[in-house]
């Protein structure tokens, strides 16, 4: 079982800065990172190289912004990562008219050399889902990952992912902060899981 779980939100996404995104997008709800977003993700990777103990397992939401964030991190840490739909975005009916489209797995594995083809998804999200259902789904996924990992796990996802990860392990997301490429750390000891810190972005202060 894992003794440390890290969670990180993806970097800046293109549709947040490009007013023309919806007119040019192949998949309107699956934008890539901006250059700034890739830089911030790279800085997360540098933090793990320079300041933190090694990570034993990396899982990412299948949305492109999270995949690209994981790819930047693992390029620095010389690791591989796995796609886990259970860490994906909240399927909020106010945001999406239907299940949001992401790149097929085959296209992702062809594009990202550090993406492992060996992982079988643990949890498949339903559409639509309430906020409570999304938190439950992400929490269940997190506990399964923690149970399957020896050592340290890093989970790459969305703002909702960070809340679900923390709530799934400690029972509440009240202390969660989820800025772009902010890091949250949870630690397990004899008394169970505790939230060490949330939303740390000191690695971006360069």
Q: Each predicted region: which residue ranges?
A:
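Acidic, low-complexity terminal tails and accessory targeting/binding regions
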Residues: 1-3, 90-104, 167-206
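Active-site-proximal alpha-helix that buttresses catalytic centers in soluble enzyme cores
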Residues: 2-83
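Generic beta-sheet signal
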Residues: 5, 149-159
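Phosphate-handling substructures
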Residues: 31-32, 77-137, 196-198
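Glycine-rich phosphate-binding loop signature in dinucleotide/nucleotide-binding domains
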Residues: 51-54, 145-151
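Short beta-strand scaffold positions
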Residues: 60-61, 136, 156-157
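Alpha-helix capping/helix-boundary segments
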Residues: 65, 161-162
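Active-site signature of alpha/beta-hydrolase-fold catalytic machinery across serine-
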Residues: 72, 164, 168
